[in-house]
């Protein structure tokens, strides 16, 4: 919660939009509203993976971020590399169309709680403006604690300004 709020505080201006892919952790809507943003909802497909056509329809000129959550809460689905790549490609097409910069934010509190051989893709390989937020409240059994971190893609051309904003917003 703290990491996502810090990220949104750093990148959103009033009425900027954040795209959430349903189903999603319900608190995201409140995090966006708390930072004076607007949540826009894209859908998933029948396999609980992001529906790219819905995502492309939902991203607009005021979109500043797309939040993904994998393994997903509440479905438990792990987004495969192909889905992450497709989401990133849709974001990049929207950036070109609207002349904007859009962050791909990956909320990963369940990343270390995968009990299959499914590989876990790393988003930094797919989009330069990507940010990872995670918490140790799940993997270390620290329910209610707010201990985690935010990682910024080292290939983000605006990483210095973003890191300054993240530090300032704490």
What is each PLM-predicted segment?
Residues 104-105:
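Residue-level marker for buried hydrophobic side chains located in beta-strands
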Residues 1-96, 111-126, 131:
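Conserved core of the PLP fold type I
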Residues 108:
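Walker B catalytic acidic pair
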Residues 90-101, 154-159:
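Alpha-helix termini
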Residues 128-170:
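Conserved core segment of the aminotransferase class I/II
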């Amino acid at each position: 919660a703290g990491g996502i709020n810090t990220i949104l505080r750093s990148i959103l201006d009033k009425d900027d939009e954040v795209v959430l892919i349903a189903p999603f952790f319900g608190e995201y809507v409140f995090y966006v509203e708390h930072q004076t943003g607007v949540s826009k909802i894209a859908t998933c497909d029948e396999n609980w993976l992001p529906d790219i056509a819905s995502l492309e329809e939902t991203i607009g000129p005021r979109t500043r971020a797309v939040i993904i959550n994998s393994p997903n809460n509440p479905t438990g689905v792990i987004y495969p590399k192909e889905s992450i790549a497709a989401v990133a490609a849709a974001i990049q097409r929207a950036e070109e169309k609207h002349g904007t910069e859009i962050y791909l934010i990956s909320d990963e509190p369940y990343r270390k709680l995968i009990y299959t051989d499914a590989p876990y893709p790393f988003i930094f390989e797919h989009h330069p403006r990507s940010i990872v937020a995670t918490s140790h409240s799940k993997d270390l059994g620290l329910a209610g604690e707010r201990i985690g971190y935010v990682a910024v893609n080292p290939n983000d051309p605006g990483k210095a300004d973003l890191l300054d904003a993240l530090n300032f917003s704490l």
